Amino acid sequence: MRRVILNNPRGFCAGVVRAIQVVETALEKWGAPIYVKHEIVHNRHVVDDLKRRGAIFIEDLSDVPSGEKVVYSAHGIPPEVREEARTRNLFDIDATCVLVTKIHSAVKLYASKGYQIILIGKKKHVEVIGIRGEAPESVTVVEKVEDVANLPFEESVPLFFVTQTTLSLDDVAEITQALKVRYPHIITLPSSSVCYATQNRQEALRSVLPKVNFVYVIGDVQSSNSNRLREVAEKRNIPARLVNSPDHISDEILNYSGDIAITAGASTPEHIVQSCISRLKELIPDLQVEEDIFAIEDVVFQPPKELRN
């Protein structure tokens, strides 16, 4: 008998729930269309569902007619986007994750105090673009540990660092250690910039890896945190696949013996997880599912002020 060990927590985090609810509530309150700058979260199933209900996803505010309503995605935006919205008389609703907003505020604050800011993250990720936009002249993005050796700052320069919220804890630890060795005076926030949900999902997966021989991460290929989950397994020599649909699960799994772990990125709907489990049961009829509870998440974020009445 083979087992699927189903990680808990998995799937939607509080920031994703809030962001999706913002678009849903806006559609209920004002009707279609509701424009959304960037995909509200990085999951094709979520985006397609909201499109069917009247959301229009755009990358450039010039695609939003003057006076219309626009929602900013959970990943955040640079300040100039907000300014453009005001100039064009757009009614904007901010669905930026509360934890991302916290990093925006910290970057703005420390830049105003004269610090140079090191932002650990992927330069092209929309979250990093938004954070860097708070103080572009003061922010340097570090993507990998090798970048630390090339930083130009003298020891006399005050330094502050933060990270993208969806990074690998392994990578962040390595880069942070390199920063502290090179710049012992560097400071950061009292708690990690990597969000609680990213940490929980990675640590939950890590805790079951000694018990399994294969991992499925249910999530979108565009999802940073889903990709990092796949890497958690691969770095520990456990084969892992990132899939976003039961159609992506092949009979390849029959080539592997032993138990299977399943987790899901923070923007993955639970019904997709369950449909993937059903597909595995078709391939392995005697498969047993066991839930492994690593942590209980009860975080809830309030809606933006525009939607509170």
Curated annotation (Swiss-Prot):
Q: Which residues bind [4Fe-4S] cluster?
A: 13, 97, 195
Binding sites annotated in the UniProt record for (2E)-4-hydroxy-3-methylbut-2-enyl diphosphate: 42, 75, 125, 165, 223-225, 267
Which residues are recorded as binding isopentenyl diphosphate? 42, 75, 125, 223-225, 267
**Record text on cofactor binding:** Binds 1 [4Fe-4S] cluster per subunit.
Give me the reactions it catalyses: isopentenyl diphosphate + 2 oxidized [2Fe-2S]-[ferredoxin] + H2O = (2E)-4-hydroxy-3-methylbut-2-enyl diphosphate + 2 reduced [2Fe-2S]-[ferredoxin] + 2 H(+); dimethylallyl diphosphate + 2 oxidized [2Fe-2S]-[ferredoxin] + H2O = (2E)-4-hydroxy-3-methylbut-2-enyl diphosphate + 2 reduced [2Fe-2S]-[ferredoxin] + 2 H(+)
Binding sites annotated in the UniProt record for dimethylallyl diphosphate:
42, 75, 125, 223-225, 267
Q: Which UniProt keywords apply?
A: 4Fe-4S, Iron, Iron-sulfur, Isoprene biosynthesis, Metal-binding, Oxidoreductase
> GO biological process: what's one of them?
dimethylallyl diphosphate biosynthetic process
GO MF terms here are: 4 iron, 4 sulfur cluster binding; 4-hydroxy-3-methylbut-2-enyl diphosphate reductase activity; metal ion binding
- EC class, as a word, reads oxidoreductase
InterPro entries xrefs: LytB/IspH
Copy the pathway line from the protein's UniProt record.
Answer: Isoprenoid biosynthesis; dimethylallyl diphosphate biosynthesis; dimethylallyl diphosphate from (2E)-4-hydroxy-3-methylbutenyl diphosphate: step 1/1; Isoprenoid biosynthesis; isopentenyl diphosphate biosynthesis via DXP pathway; isopentenyl diphosphate from 1-deoxy-D-xylulose 5-phosphate: step 6/6
Please give the cofactor(s) recorded in the UniProt entry for this protein: [4Fe-4S] cluster
Q: For this protein, what is the EC number?
A: 1.17.7.4
| Active site (record annotation) | 127
Q: Member of which family?
A: Belongs to the IspH family.
The task this protein performs is described as: Catalyzes the conversion of 1-hydroxy-2-methyl-2-(E)-butenyl 4-diphosphate (HMBPP) into a mixture of isopentenyl diphosphate (IPP) and dimethylallyl diphosphate (DMAPP). Acts in the terminal step of the DOXP/MEP pathway for isoprenoid precursor biosynthesis.
Q: What is this protein called?
A: 4-hydroxy-3-methylbut-2-enyl diphosphate reductase
| Species assigned in the record | Chlamydia caviae (strain ATCC VR-813 / DSM 19441 / 03DC25 / GPIC) (Chlamydophila caviae)
